Structures are given as structure tokens and as C-alpha cells.
Amino acid sequence: MIQVESTLQVADNSGAKKVACIKVLGGSHRRYASVGDIVVVSVKEAIPHSKVKKGDVMKAVIVRTAKEVRRMDGSYIKFDGNAAVLLSTQGEPIGTRIFGPVARELRAMNFMKIISLAPEVL
């Protein structure tokens, strides 16, 4: 459950380490984002000489949330923390590697590139 000013870990090798949500996309007054939703983020922490710099504003897709997500079969899944993958303007991931597991819900949102790069899909 991500809202404005939530901080997230970055689960790819784009160079950003931490980002902060500045807008939840989808609806005029949408308050929360969950796994598979797209948010606008600002880079708060980045490693030097990387693809992204501190202060960059870009889109990201949520891949893990600490708040549990209910599945159609009635089961729930939750992770230890909140994480996102940075997206280019075309909607493709900026990084070439994904770190940590990602939720299966991304497959339904057609983020196949992220699913194929992830080491584990839960």
C-alpha cells in the first residue's frame, strides 16, 4: 500500500537505491498503489556514475509491498518491504537485472520483461 511520500527500495540495477512516491497514477484522486500499479517517483539516493541521478523524476512499477495483497484463490502474499522497478518513458525497465522476488500479479499487468528478468516469481 504505497501513497504519496512513501519511500521504496529500487529492485533493479538502474543505479537508484531509494525513491519516494510523488504521485499514484490512475484516477484523479487515487490514494494508494499496490503491486503492479504505476507511480511517479523521485530518486532520493543513487550510486555515482549511473543511469539515473538523484532528483530525477520518473515512473516506476511496484513489485513488492509490505501490505498483504489478496489473490483470487483467497490466499495472501506480503513481502518484507516495499520495492519498485524504474521504467523508461516507453514503459520498459531501465535496469537489466532485477533483484529479489516479484509478485505474480505483474504477469496479469503485462510486465513480462520484469517477470523474465526476476530470479523468483511468487
Curated annotation (Swiss-Prot):
- Work out whether the entry's keyword set contains 4Fe-4S: no
**Gene3D superfamilies, per the entry:** Ribosomal protein L14
Protein name (database record): Large ribosomal subunit protein uL14
Q: Which PANTHER family match?
A: 50S/60S RIBOSOMAL PROTEIN L14/L23 (PTHR11761), LARGE RIBOSOMAL SUBUNIT PROTEIN UL14M (PTHR11761:SF3)
Organism, by scientific name, is Desulfovibrio desulfuricans (strain ATCC 27774 / DSM 6949 / MB)
**Biological role:** Binds to 23S rRNA. Forms part of two intersubunit bridges in the 70S ribosome.
The entry assigns this protein to a family as follows: Belongs to the universal ribosomal protein uL14 family.
Q: Which GO terms describe its molecular function?
A: large ribosomal subunit rRNA binding; structural constituent of ribosome
Q: Which Pfam families match?
A: Ribosomal_L14
Gene assigned in the entry = rplN
Assembly mode: Part of the 50S ribosomal subunit. Forms a cluster with proteins L3 and L19. In the 70S ribosome, L14 and L19 interact and together make contacts with the 16S rRNA in bridges B5 and B8.
| Top-level division of the source organism's lineage | Bacteria
This protein's record includes keyword RNA-binding: yes
* Gene Ontology BP, a term: translation
Q: Which GO terms describe its cellular component?
A: cytosolic large ribosomal subunit
Q: What is the lineage of its organism?
A: Bacteria, Pseudomonadati, Thermodesulfobacteriota, Desulfovibrionia, Desulfovibrionales
Instruction: Please give the InterPro entries that the UniProt record associates with this protein.
Output: Ribosomal_uL14 (IPR000218), Ribosomal_uL14_bac-type (IPR005745), Ribosomal_uL14_CS (IPR019972), Ribosomal_uL14_sf (IPR036853)
